[in-house]
C-alpha cells in the first residue's frame, strides 16, 4: 500500500497513543517524526526525564524507566571541558572553554554553531565583546568600561533557557551573566542574514521561556516579561500583572527558580533551608492579588531549574519517583542532610510534592559529578 492510499497514518489517536507508549524511547522519537499527525499524538504522551553524564570523549545517557545505558561520542572532544547550560527535548545548550556556544542533539549528534560573541550585538547601548589576549575569555566593553567574562563564570552561574521546535528546527537561546545582562539569539525559518546576539540590561536571578515570552525574576522580587515575537526582545505593551505583585517569602531560601506550566501559568519554585528542608511551589492568584502555595501539578512534573513543566506518567513506573507531582533536582539544588554532615551526597534525586519525600538516584554517580537531567521528546 502506498503512503498516499487510505490515509495510512491517520490511526485513531487513542490507538496510536497506546502504540507510542509501548515503544522504547528511541523508537518513540523516530515515530514522532513520521508525519504531522503522529507528531501531534506523540506530544500528548507522558514523558519522563533521562540523565546525561559528560566524561572524556564519551557521554553516558541513562534511561531510568528502561534501566538502560547508552554510550555516545557526541563531539569528539573532552566533554568534561564543556558546560551544559540548558536543555530542551533532545537538545542541550553548551559552552566550551573558548566561550563558543553550541546546540547539540544528544541522539543524532547534530550540532548547531551559535554566533560568535565577537559579532556585533543588538541593543540600544554601545556594547561589544573583545577577545582576551590569551584567548581565555572576552572583555565585555560598555562606555569604555570593561569586565572579563571567562568559561569559569558559567561553572556555577547557569541562568539560561533553550527552546527548540522539533518539527521545523526553529530555536531560541538566552543566557545571563553578572546577573544583569541577558544575551539572546532567535532563529526562525530560513532567515540566517542577521546572526547577532541581542543584549538586554535587566536584573536577572532566574528566567523561564514559553510561547514567545521570557519571564525574568529580579532581585527586588518582581517578574519582568520580555516579548520574543519580533526580531529582538522587547517589553510587551500589555499589562504585566507580576509587576504589581512582588513575591515576598519570609523563610530562608536556598535557591529560587521560575517555571511555566503547559497552560502558561508562572510558578516560583523554592528550595528551602532550615529544619523544614523541602521544595515548594507558589503561583500568583490574581483574584486575591497574592501568591499561594501549589499543592499539586496535576498530570505534570518539573525539573528544578529547567523552566517548564512536562506531562508525566500518573504512577511511578520504575520505583525512582518519576511521576506526576514530582520534582527532579541535582545535588547542588537541595541542601540535604548529606551536605550538613559532610557525608558524600547522592548526585541527584526526585522530590514528591504530595508527601515531601525524596527518592535518591545513585546509578551513574560513580562516573562523574558532571551530570544533568533532560527530557527526550519535549518539543
Curated annotation (Swiss-Prot):
Residues 6-53 form the F-box domain. Pfam families: Beta-prop_KIB1-4, F-box. InterPro entries: F-box-like_dom_sf, F-box_BR-signaling, F-box_dom, KIB1-4_b-propeller. PANTHER family: GENOME ASSEMBLY, CHROMOSOME: A05 (PTHR44259:SF98), OS07G0183000 PROTEIN-RELATED (PTHR44259). This is Putative F-box protein At2g33190. It comes from Arabidopsis thaliana. The lineage of its organism: Eukaryota, Viridiplantae, Streptophyta, Embryophyta, Tracheophyta.
Amino acid at each position: 500500500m502506498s503512503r498516499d492510499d487510505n490515509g495510512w497514518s491517520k490511526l485513531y489517536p487513542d490507538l496510536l497513543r497506546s502504540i507510542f507508549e509501548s515503544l522504547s524511547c528511541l523508537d518513540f522519537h523516530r515515530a514522532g517524526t513520521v508525519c504531522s499527525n503522529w507528531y501531534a499524538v506523540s506530544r500528548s504522551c507522558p514523558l519522563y526525564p533521562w540523565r546525561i553524564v559528560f566524561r572524556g570523549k564519551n557521554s553516558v545517557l541513562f534511561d531510568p524507566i528502561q534501566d538502560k545505558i547508552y554510550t555516545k561520542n557526541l563531539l569528539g572532544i573532552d566533554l568534561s571541558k564543556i558546560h551544559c547550560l540548558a536543555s530542551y527535548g533532545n537538545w542541550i545548550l553548551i559552552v566550551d572553554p573558548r566561550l563558543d556556544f553550541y546546540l547539540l542533539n544528544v541522539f543524532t549528534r547534530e550540532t548547531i554553531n551559535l554566533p560568535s560573541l565577537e559579532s556585533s550585538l543588538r541593543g540600544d547601548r554601545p556594547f561589544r565583546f573583545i577577545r582576551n589576549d590569551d584567548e581565555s575569555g572576552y572583555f565585555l566593553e560598555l562606555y569604555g568600561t570593561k569586565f572579563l567574562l571567562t568559561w569559569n563564570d558559567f561553572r556555577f552561574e547557569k541562568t539560561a533557557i533553550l527552546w527548540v521546535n522539533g518539527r521545523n528546527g526553529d530555536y531560541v537561546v538566552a543566557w545571563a551573566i553578572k546577573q544583569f545582562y541577558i544575551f539572546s539569539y532567535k532563529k526562525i525559518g530560513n532567515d540566517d542574514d542577521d546572526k547577532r546576539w541581542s543584549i538586554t540590561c535587566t536584573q536577572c536571578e532566574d528566567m523561564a521561556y514559553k510561547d514567545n515570552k521570557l519571564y525574568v525574576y529580579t532581585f527586588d522580587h518582581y517578574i519582568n516579561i520580555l516579548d520574543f515575537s519580533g526580531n529582538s526582545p522587547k517589553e510587551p505593551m500589555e499589562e504585566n500583572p507580576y509587576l504589581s505583585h512582588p513575591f515576598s517569602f519570609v523563610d530562608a531560601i536556598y535557591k529560587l527558580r521560575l517555571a511555566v506550566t503547559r497552560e502558561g501559568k508562572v510558578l516560583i519554585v523554592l528550595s528551602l533551608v532550615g529544619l523544614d528542608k523541602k521544595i515548594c511551589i507558589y503561583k500568583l492568584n490574581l483574584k486575591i492579588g497574592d501568591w499561594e502555595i501549589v499543592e499539586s501539578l496535576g498530570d505534570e512534573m518539573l525539573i528544578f531549574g529547567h523552566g517548564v513543566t512536562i506531562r508525566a506518567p500518573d504512577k511511578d513506573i520504575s520505583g525512582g519517583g518519576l511521576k506526576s507531582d514530582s520534582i527532579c533536582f541535582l545535588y547542588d539544588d537541595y541542601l540535604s542532610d548529606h551536605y550538613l554532615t559532610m557525608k558524600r551526597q547522592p548526585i541527584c534525586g526526585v522530590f514528591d510534592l504530595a508527601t515531601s519525600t525524596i527518592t535518591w538516584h545513585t546509578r551513574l554517580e560513580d562516573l562523574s559529578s558532571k551530570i544533568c537531567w533532560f527530557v527526550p521528546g519535549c518539543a
